[in-house]
């Protein structure tokens, strides 16, 4: 299967640069995966498509203000550091720019010495392992000095940091938001719960690999990035009960989907309390074992995410829906509109 098979024409002006004022006022493209029928709604109408007994699975990861600007302690040269994931308490894998200026032993100072980092190892593609030193609480210092690492296709400044955060974000660790969840408000979640829908949380820390372009011609040759995930005992119990009773599991976002599909793949079709790293790569003709439906945003052409949803609804149906969305001038990508595949 070729990467080109997942291409579509997207006018640049349809890439949403800022979030809408009201989270639930996004548009919703509903795709019936059995009939390929498309319906255009507003996101606040999502309750129309949910029913008592459904499980709605949300990713409660929290985006770190992971972009830091510092200077080398010896030369004063400016260095940008992007936190990727924590290895030990004060040791992180990071991306640095310009990479050639950061070698083993290089010390970088942030915020007039409030935070310091020393490079202890080199990785590929500008990656480094760094240990951090500071006085106080690391995440509080990060809140003061760091910036939200917005996706590369967003050129505008973010007016409010919390608009790149879901209202239920809790577990710190992501370099990017699980953007399908940005459409929910506390009120909408309360309304959904009042319908008898089970709200279930899992965690997957979104890495920058989610934005990495596919650089091979053949889908099967792509080397998928890894991300850390976890599921609690109570989440596993609720989901297993739903599956056993034939009730629907609807995941919010491709990150929740990666988590659920990884767990049932690795545990004989069951949900279990677990944590680990997943590099699952979902593309046609993958057969989903965990989910019955998916709420997601509109993805980049030729991306691994459009491949995933093509496995769920069929490539032709997805590309037809995307072409319809372009024609209807939907807003695309992280701050854009949503799609429900059911």
UniProtKB/Swiss-Prot annotation:
- Show the GO MF annotations: S-adenosylmethionine:tRNA ribosyltransferase-isomerase activity
- Source taxon at top rank: Bacteria
Pathway named in the protein's UniProt entry: tRNA modification; tRNA-queuosine biosynthesis
As recorded in UniProt, its EC number(s) are 2.4.99.17
Record keywords: Cytoplasm, Queuosine biosynthesis, S-adenosyl-L-methionine, Transferase
Give the principal location in a single coarse category.
cytoplasm
Task: Please state where this protein is localized.
Answer: Cytoplasm
Q: Does the keyword DNA repair apply?
A: no
According to its UniProt entry, the protein's GO biological process terms are: queuosine biosynthetic process; tRNA wobble guanine modification
Q: Which reaction does it catalyse?
A: 7-aminomethyl-7-carbaguanosine(34) in tRNA + S-adenosyl-L-methionine = epoxyqueuosine(34) in tRNA + adenine + L-methionine + 2 H(+)
GO cellular component term, pick one: cytoplasm
Question: SUPFAM superfamilies in the record, alphabetically?
Answer: QueA-like
Q: Self-association or partners: how does it assemble?
A: Monomer.
Task: Describe the family membership recorded for this protein in Swiss-Prot or TrEMBL.
Answer: Belongs to the QueA family.
Q: What does this protein do?
A: Transfers and isomerizes the ribose moiety from AdoMet to the 7-aminomethyl group of 7-deazaguanine (preQ1-tRNA) to give epoxyqueuosine (oQ-tRNA).
Official protein name in the record: S-adenosylmethionine:tRNA ribosyltransferase-isomerase
What is the native source organism of this protein?
Answer: Oceanobacillus iheyensis (strain DSM 14371 / CIP 107618 / JCM 11309 / KCTC 3954 / HTE831)
């Amino acid at each position: 299967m070729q990467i080109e098979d997942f291409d579509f024409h997207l006018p640049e002006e349809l890439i949403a640069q800022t979030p809408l004022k009201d989270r639930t006022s996004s548009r919703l493209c509903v795709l019936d995966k059995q009939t390929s029928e498309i319906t255009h709604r507003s996101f606040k109408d999502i309750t129309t498509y949910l029913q008592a007994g459904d499980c709605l699975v949300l990713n409660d990861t929290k985006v770190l203000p992971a972009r830091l600007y510092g200077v080398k302690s010896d030369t004063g040269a400016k260095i940008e550091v992007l936190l990727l994931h924590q290895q030990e308490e004060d040791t992180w894998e990071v991306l640095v720019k310009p990479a050639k200026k950061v070698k083993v032993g290089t010390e970088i100072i942030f915020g007039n010495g409030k935070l310091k980092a020393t490079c202890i190892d080199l990785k590929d593609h500008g990656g480094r392992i760094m240990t951090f030193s500071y006085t106080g609480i690391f995440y509080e210092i990060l809140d003061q000095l760091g910036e939200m690492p917005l996706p590369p296709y967003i050129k505008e400044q973010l007016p409010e940091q919390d608009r790149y955060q879901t209202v239920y974000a809790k577990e710190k660790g992501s370099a990017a938001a699980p953007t399908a969840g940005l459409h929910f408000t506390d009120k909408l979640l309360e309304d959904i719960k009042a319908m008898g829908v089970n709200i279930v949380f899992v965690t997957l820390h979104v890495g920058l690999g989610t934005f990495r372009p596919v650089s091979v011609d053949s889908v099967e040759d792509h080397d998928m990035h890894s991300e850390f995930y976890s599921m609690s005992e109570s989440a596993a119990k609720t989901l297993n009960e739903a599956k056993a009773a034939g009730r629907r599991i609807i995941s919010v976002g491709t990150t929740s989907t990666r988590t659920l599909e990884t767990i049932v793949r690795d545990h004989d079709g069951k949900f279990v309390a677990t944590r680990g790293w997943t590099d699952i790569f979902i593309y046609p003709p993958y057969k989903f074992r965990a989910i019955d439906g998916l709420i997601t945003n509109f993805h980049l052409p030729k991306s691994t995410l459009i491949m995933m949803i093509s496995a769920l609804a069929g490539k032709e149906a997805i590309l037809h829906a995307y072409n319809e969305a372009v024609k209807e001038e939907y807003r695309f990508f992280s701050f854009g509109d949503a799609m429900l595949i059911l």
